[in-house]
């Protein structure tokens, strides 16, 4: 599908349920519609970032603690920020296990194939998320700080600024809040708890 058609599809979507992604381990694409009624935490991840250990372990912790109550954490590896996800899809899990975080680490949440989150080749899910939530709620001025590191085109004001930006999606599939890379994953827990306490959506 060409970039224009991807952008049109993202603009027409009303929720994340319109999108699908292929699991990192391979197999058929997963429709996010299959997660209807769940609270979703979506992050663009990288295995060689300065916050890889912190964010990956905190993503695991949230999935472990809140998964039984209806949270689903989704990770999308991306190499657009400092080339910090330069491994092939089939190498990423071993990188996480033996390098960073290392120590036998295994993600307990859903990881998908590498994708782009900005520019003409952006995954339509991220084009939709950026349109729905143009800036992080904790830092509305968050932007890529070093123009030399911008490798995509076109550049937009609502672009993801770096690895580990977070998007919180309600049980109706509607994006509710975006958090910058500086906002620790574990600190989203109160917002997740508030959504889980409302019970499943009938949407």
Curated annotation (Swiss-Prot):
Cell membrane: is it a keyword of this entry?
no
Task: Tell me yes or no: is Lipid metabolism among this UniProt entry's keywords.
Answer: yes
Tell me where in this chain the PTM N6-acetyllysine is found: 88, 114, 148
* UniProt keywords, alphabetically: Acetylation, Cytoplasm, Lipid metabolism, Mitochondrion, Oxidoreductase, Peroxidase, Phosphoprotein, Selenocysteine
What domain of life does the native source organism fall in? Answer: Eukaryota
Task: List the CDD domains.
Answer: GSH_Peroxidase
Known catalytic reactions:
2 glutathione + H2O2 = glutathione disulfide + 2 H2O; a hydroperoxy polyunsaturated fatty acid + 2 glutathione = a hydroxy polyunsaturated fatty acid + glutathione disulfide + H2O; tert-butyl hydroperoxide + 2 glutathione = tert-butanol + glutathione disulfide + H2O; cumene hydroperoxide + 2 glutathione = 2-phenylpropan-2-ol + glutathione disulfide + H2O
Q: Which residues of this protein are catalytic? A: 49
EC number(s): the record gives 1.11.1.9, 1.11.1.12
- In the record, Phosphoserine modifications are located at 34, 197, 201
GO terms of molecular function? glutathione peroxidase activity; phospholipid-hydroperoxide glutathione peroxidase activity; protein tyrosine kinase binding; SH3 domain binding
Q: What is its main location?
A: cytoplasm
Instruction: Give the InterPro entries listed for this entry.
Output: Glutathione_peroxidase, GPX_AS, GPX_CS, Thioredoxin-like_sf
* One Pfam family linked to the record: GSHPx
Q: Choose any GO biological process term that the UniProt entry carries and state it.
A: positive regulation of phosphatidylinositol 3-kinase/protein kinase B signal transduction
Quote the cellular component terms of the Gene Ontology held in the record.
cytoplasm; cytosol; mitochondrial matrix; mitochondrion
Entry-annotated residues carrying N6-succinyllysine:
88, 114, 148
Q: Where in the cell is it found?
A: Cytoplasm; Mitochondrion
The record's account of tissue expression is: Expressed in platelets (at protein level).
Which family does the entry's similarity section mention?
Answer: Belongs to the glutathione peroxidase family.
**Described function:** Catalyzes the reduction of hydroperoxides in a glutathione-dependent manner thus regulating cellular redox homeostasis. Can reduce small soluble hydroperoxides such as H2O2, cumene hydroperoxide and tert-butyl hydroperoxide, as well as several fatty acid-derived hydroperoxides. In platelets catalyzes the reduction of 12-hydroperoxyeicosatetraenoic acid, the primary product of the arachidonate 12-lipoxygenase pathway.
Q: How does it assemble?
A: Homotetramer. Interacts with MIEN1.
PANTHER family found in the cross-reference section: GLUTATHIONE PEROXIDASE, GLUTATHIONE PEROXIDASE 1
The identity of this protein, by name, is Glutathione peroxidase 1
Tell me the organism: Homo sapiens (Human)
> Gene name?
GPX1
């Amino acid at each position: 599908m060409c970039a224009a058609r991807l952008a049109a599809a993202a603009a027409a979507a009303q929720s994340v349920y319109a999108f699908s992604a292929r699991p990192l381990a391979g197999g058929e694409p997963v429709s996010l519609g299959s997660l209807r009624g769940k609270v979703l935490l979506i992050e663009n991840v990288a295995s060689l970032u300065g916050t890889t250990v912190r964010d990956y372990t905190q993503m695991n912790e949230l999935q472990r603690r809140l998964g039984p109550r209806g949270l689903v954490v989704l990770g999308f590896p991306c190499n657009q920020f400092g080339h910090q996800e330069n491994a092939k899809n089939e190498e990423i899990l071993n990188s996480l296990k033996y390098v960073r975080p290392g120590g036998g680490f295994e993600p307990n949440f859903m990881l998908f194939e590498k994708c782009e989150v900005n520019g003409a080749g952006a995954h339509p899910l991220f084009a939709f998320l950026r349109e729905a939530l143009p800036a992080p709620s904790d830092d509305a001025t968050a932007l890529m700080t070093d123009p030399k590191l911008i490798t995509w085109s076109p550049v937009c004001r609502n672009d993801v600024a770096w690895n580990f930006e977070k998007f919180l999606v309600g049980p109706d599939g509607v994006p509710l809040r975006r958090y910058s890379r500086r906002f620790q994953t574990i600190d989203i827990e109160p917002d997740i708890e508030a959504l889980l306490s409302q019970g499943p959506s009938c949407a």
